[in-house]
Protein backbone atom coordinates (compact mmCIF):
# COMPACT_ATOMS: atom_id res chain seq x y z
CA UNK A 1 0.00 0.00 0.00
CA UNK A 2 1.31 3.42 -0.95
CA UNK A 3 -0.14 5.32 2.03
CA UNK A 4 -0.31 3.91 5.54
CA UNK A 5 -3.15 4.85 7.92
CA UNK A 6 -0.81 6.87 10.17
CA UNK A 7 0.02 9.12 7.20
CA UNK A 8 -3.55 10.46 7.09
CA UNK A 9 -2.58 12.87 9.89
CA UNK A 10 -1.59 15.40 7.22
CA UNK A 11 -5.26 15.56 6.14
CA UNK A 12 -7.28 14.63 9.25
CA UNK A 13 -6.53 14.66 12.95
CA UNK A 14 -6.19 11.13 14.36
CA UNK A 15 -9.06 11.71 16.81
CA UNK A 16 -11.35 12.66 13.90
CA UNK A 17 -10.40 9.49 12.01
CA UNK A 18 -11.02 7.53 15.21
CA UNK A 19 -14.48 9.07 15.63
CA UNK A 20 -15.49 8.45 12.02
CA UNK A 21 -14.30 4.84 11.93
CA UNK A 22 -15.00 4.14 15.62
CA UNK A 23 -11.30 3.28 15.97
CA UNK A 24 -11.55 0.52 13.36
CA UNK A 25 -8.19 0.52 11.58
CA UNK A 26 -9.46 -1.99 8.99
CA UNK A 27 -11.95 0.60 7.77
CA UNK A 28 -9.17 3.17 7.28
CA UNK A 29 -7.15 0.60 5.33
CA UNK A 30 -10.22 -0.19 3.23
CA UNK A 31 -10.68 3.51 2.35
CA UNK A 32 -6.99 3.85 1.48
CA UNK A 33 -7.07 0.77 -0.76
CA UNK A 34 -10.21 1.95 -2.53
CA UNK A 35 -8.63 5.40 -3.02
CA UNK A 36 -5.56 3.76 -4.57
CA UNK A 37 -7.74 1.64 -6.86
CA UNK A 38 -9.71 4.74 -7.86
CA UNK A 39 -6.52 6.59 -8.78
CA UNK A 40 -5.06 3.58 -10.61
CA UNK A 41 -8.02 3.85 -12.98
CA UNK A 42 -6.75 7.25 -14.08
CA UNK A 43 -3.10 6.23 -14.33
CA UNK A 44 -3.52 3.10 -16.45
CA UNK A 45 -0.73 4.03 -18.89
CA UNK A 46 1.92 4.21 -16.17
CA UNK A 47 3.76 1.36 -14.46
CA UNK A 48 1.41 0.87 -11.51
CA UNK A 49 3.71 -1.62 -9.78
CA UNK A 50 6.46 0.99 -9.71
CA UNK A 51 4.09 3.71 -8.47
CA UNK A 52 1.99 1.77 -5.95
CA UNK A 53 4.02 -1.36 -5.24
CA UNK A 54 2.46 -4.75 -4.59
CA UNK A 55 1.34 -6.57 -1.48
CA UNK A 56 4.91 -7.83 -1.02
CA UNK A 57 7.05 -5.09 -2.60
CA UNK A 58 7.26 -1.40 -1.85
CA UNK A 59 6.88 1.13 -4.67
CA UNK A 60 10.10 1.96 -6.50
CA UNK A 61 8.97 5.50 -7.39
CA UNK A 62 8.26 7.85 -4.48
CA UNK A 63 6.09 10.78 -5.52
CA UNK A 64 4.66 12.99 -2.79
CA UNK A 65 1.98 14.45 -5.09
CA UNK A 66 0.64 10.97 -5.76
CA UNK A 67 0.62 10.17 -2.05
CA UNK A 68 -1.17 13.47 -1.36
CA UNK A 69 -3.77 12.58 -3.98
CA UNK A 70 -4.44 9.19 -2.34
CA UNK A 71 -4.74 10.83 1.08
CA UNK A 72 -7.17 13.48 -0.20
CA UNK A 73 -9.41 10.89 -1.88
CA UNK A 74 -9.41 8.62 1.18
CA UNK A 75 -10.01 11.54 3.54
CA UNK A 76 -12.85 12.87 1.41
CA UNK A 77 -14.54 9.49 1.45
CA UNK A 78 -14.03 9.21 5.21
CA UNK A 79 -15.58 12.59 6.00
CA UNK A 80 -18.50 11.86 3.68
CA UNK A 81 -19.34 8.93 5.92
CA UNK A 82 -19.53 11.11 9.01
CA UNK A 83 -18.11 14.55 9.52
CA UNK A 84 -17.57 15.27 13.20
CA UNK A 85 -16.21 18.80 13.42
CA UNK A 86 -14.89 18.81 9.83
CA UNK A 87 -15.38 21.50 7.18
CA UNK A 88 -16.61 19.61 4.11
CA UNK A 89 -16.10 22.61 1.82
CA UNK A 90 -12.36 22.44 2.43
CA UNK A 91 -12.30 18.77 1.44
CA UNK A 92 -14.44 19.48 -1.63
CA UNK A 93 -11.94 22.19 -2.67
CA UNK A 94 -9.05 19.75 -2.17
CA UNK A 95 -10.94 17.15 -4.23
CA UNK A 96 -11.51 19.67 -7.04
CA UNK A 97 -7.84 20.66 -6.98
CA UNK A 98 -6.46 17.11 -7.04
CA UNK A 99 -9.13 15.28 -9.07
CA UNK A 100 -11.43 17.85 -10.67
CA UNK A 101 -14.18 17.38 -13.22
CA UNK A 102 -14.39 17.35 -17.02
CA UNK A 103 -15.21 21.05 -17.01
CA UNK A 104 -12.52 21.95 -14.51
CA UNK A 105 -9.84 19.23 -14.52
CA UNK A 106 -7.61 18.79 -11.51
CA UNK A 107 -4.09 17.46 -11.16
CA UNK A 108 -4.99 13.78 -11.65
CA UNK A 109 -7.06 14.38 -14.79
CA UNK A 110 -4.29 16.59 -16.20
CA UNK A 111 -1.79 13.76 -15.62
CA UNK A 112 -4.16 11.29 -17.29
CA UNK A 113 -4.64 13.57 -20.31
CA UNK A 114 -0.91 14.24 -20.62
CA UNK A 115 -1.17 17.96 -19.78
CA UNK A 116 1.08 17.38 -16.78
CA UNK A 117 3.95 14.96 -17.25
CA UNK A 118 5.36 13.58 -14.02
CA UNK A 119 8.57 11.67 -14.53
CA UNK A 120 6.95 8.31 -13.94
CA UNK A 121 7.76 5.15 -15.87
CA UNK A 122 5.27 3.93 -18.44
CA UNK A 123 4.03 0.36 -18.50
CA UNK A 124 6.63 -2.01 -19.91
CA UNK A 125 5.90 -3.40 -23.36
CA UNK A 126 4.25 -6.80 -23.44
CA UNK A 127 6.85 -9.28 -24.77
CA UNK A 128 4.05 -11.48 -26.15
CA UNK A 129 2.98 -8.76 -28.57
CA UNK A 130 3.83 -9.83 -32.10
CA UNK A 131 5.52 -7.56 -34.62
CA UNK A 132 2.77 -7.54 -37.22
CA UNK A 133 2.67 -4.83 -39.82
CA UNK A 134 -0.97 -3.84 -39.59
CA UNK A 135 -0.86 -2.18 -43.00
CA UNK A 136 -0.34 -5.58 -44.65
CA UNK A 137 -3.29 -7.23 -42.93
CA UNK A 138 -6.35 -7.62 -45.13
CA UNK A 139 -8.70 -4.99 -43.86
CA UNK A 140 -12.17 -3.91 -44.98
CA UNK A 141 -11.05 -0.29 -44.80
CA UNK A 142 -9.45 0.91 -48.03
CA UNK A 143 -7.31 4.04 -48.17
CA UNK A 144 -6.74 5.69 -51.53
CA UNK A 145 -6.67 9.02 -53.27
CA UNK A 146 -7.11 10.32 -56.79
CA UNK A 147 -4.11 10.92 -58.98
CA UNK A 148 -2.76 14.41 -58.84
CA UNK A 149 -3.68 16.39 -61.94
CA UNK A 150 -2.21 19.48 -63.41
CA UNK A 151 -4.83 21.62 -65.07
CA UNK A 152 -3.95 24.47 -67.38
CA UNK A 153 -6.51 27.01 -68.40
Question: What is the predicted role of each segment?
Answer:
Residues 1-64, 125-153:
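Conserved short "hinge" loops at termini or chain/domain junctions
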Residues 7, 27, 34, 65, ...:
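Exposed alpha-helical structural elements
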Residues 76-153:
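Short loop/turn elements at secondary-structure junctions
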Residues 39-42, 46, 73-85:
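Amphipathic alpha-helical interaction segments
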Residues 64-73:
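Elongated alpha-helical scaffolds
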